[in-house]
Amino acid sequence: SERPVVLFVQQESAMFVLPELESPKIGDLNIDYISYDDREGPEPAFAKFSKSSRFSGLGVESRLIRHLELDLISSHGISSEIVDATDIFAELRMSKSEVEINHMTKAVKIAEESLVSILDRMRAGVTEKQFAAELVIQLLRNGSDTGLPFSPIVASGVNAANPHHFPTDKEFKEGELVIVDWGATHEG
């Protein structure tokens, strides 16, 4: 989101400060939040949070946090020290619960079944865009969340050399290489 979204985590609790329009994404996480709308902006929400919480130190992912969020945290005195905790966050992401592993396994199965179900459509004359669209349809039919992790990359011939290619109206040709990079999500 272009609007500030910050999750503050302490040993026994967590709190989001986020735009009201993002609050449905929290879903069943059972995490408290303070929200704001575009009319008022984030300032009052961060001010409200600062009245209830103070940190002696705050770890952030230095490559991901924007100046906007850092300024809101600093200007409201939420933390006296901000440190780079990128390595800690990376380590935390490596640890998955059984439920998370099951969701990831299901997402892989959805992705594999979706591609296999349309491989017969990968033939000369079909465009990269057409194949990508069919793949998205199959991902959704097979149970992927509507928020795909990324738009499928379908790149044929010379386009296959571009790792971040967006599907075009280029038609597949007989015998040429086709790269497909795709994924599914299941329950987040």
Language model feature labels by segment:
Residues S1, T86-F89, S95, V126-G188:
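Short catalytic-site patches enriched in acidic/histidine residues
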Residues E61-S62, L119-T127:
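Conserved short loop/turn motifs at secondary-structure junctions
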Residues S1-S114:
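A composition/biophysics-driven feature that prefers long, compositionally simple stretches
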